[in-house]
């Protein structure tokens, strides 16, 4: 069974991961040496706990974004997704077929689309198609 990690261990590990992400890996022994170099950890036992949690966080980071840790790589990836502009607009189709109710709503909102075509749909036809 696992043990509960203290707030101190978690906070220290998160700060080390944020600042020294490039130096860390998935190996506990290597992370232990890096933690010893970059931080003043008072005891061997505390250092091992911090290194263990660093290794745990690194595994989680590989799977996806981790709450409470902001890495520049993740921030850039998120911004890239937010700024994505599709090559072809969904509105650039030859004809947009809508029913009369939708056309009335667009007119009410003062939205004019050049390729809009109003079609008459019957409830009976709609049921037969599905």
UniProtKB/Swiss-Prot annotation:
One of its GO terms (cellular component) is cytosol. One of its GO terms (biological process) is translation. Keywords: Ribonucleoprotein, Ribosomal protein. Pfam families: Ribosomal_S17e. One of its GO terms (molecular function) is structural constituent of ribosome. SUPFAM superfamilies: Rps17e-like. The keyword Ribosomal protein applies. The keyword Repeat does not apply. Belongs to the eukaryotic ribosomal protein eS17 family. This is Small ribosomal subunit protein eS17. The lineage of its organism: Eukaryota, Sar, Alveolata, Apicomplexa, Aconoidasida.
């Amino acid at each position: 069974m696992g043990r509960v990690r203290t707030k101190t261990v978690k906070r220290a590990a998160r700060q080390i991961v944020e600042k020294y992400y490039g130096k860390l890996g998935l190996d506990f022994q290597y992370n232990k040496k890096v933690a010893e170099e970059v931080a003043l950890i008072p005891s061997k036992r505390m250092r091992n706990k911090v290194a263990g949690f660093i290794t745990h966080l690194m595994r989680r980071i590989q799977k996806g974004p981790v709450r409470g840790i902001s890495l520049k790589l993740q921030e850039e990836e998120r911004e890239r997704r937010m700024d994505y502009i599709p090559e072809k607009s969904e509105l650039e189709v030859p004809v947009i077929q809508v029913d009369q109710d939708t056309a009335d709503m667009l007119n009410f909102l003062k939205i004019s689309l050049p390729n809009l075509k109003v079609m008459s749909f019957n409830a009976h036809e709609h049921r037969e198609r599905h």
